[in-house]
Amino acid sequence: MIGYVTLGTNDRARGAKFYDAICRELGVGRMMENEKFIAWGAPGGGAGIGLTRPFDGKPASVGNGVMVALEARDEDQVQRLYEIALANGGTCEGTPGPRGEGFYAAYFRDPDGNKLNAFCRPA
């Protein structure tokens, strides 16, 4: 259903470092790049994530209530994604752990304040 999500940044290099590390753990890389925009995803398609300075020239800001969820293989990968996020300028919004029956997640923000979550559905 979702093709890609684009997030705003005020520091493209800093944001690229963060998403390069996160996407490497997810097994995907940059699939599109120009001087204004970077997109990460699988070469054959599927959902992707983009990063850009806002096209209107105003500073990037965080959407209240907006969150991007990244599906992990298992609880260990949720933990790794959380650690990678914090090691690359992200901030904690909720440590890894169960969030109700059959749902395990960690919450964090990227260096620009965009909220993300890494999750899996353990058996």
Language model regions located:
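Hydrophobic pocket/interface hotspot
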Residues: G15, Y19, V78, A85
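Structured beta->alpha junctions
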Residues: D11, L70, D74, G97-G100
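N-terminal beta-strand motif that seeds the catalytic metal site of vicinal oxygen chelate
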Residues: M1-A16, V68, P122-A123
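Core segments of cupin and vicinal oxygen chelate
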Residues: L7-G48
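Vicinal oxygen chelate
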Residues: L26, Y82-A123
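Conserved beta-strand segments that form the floor/walls of ligand-binding pockets within enzyme
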Residues: Y4-T6, G50, M67, Y107, ...
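Short glycine-enriched loop/turn motifs at secondary-structure junctions
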Residues: M1, S61-N64, G100
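Long, continuous compositionally biased terminal/linker segments
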Residues: G41-R80
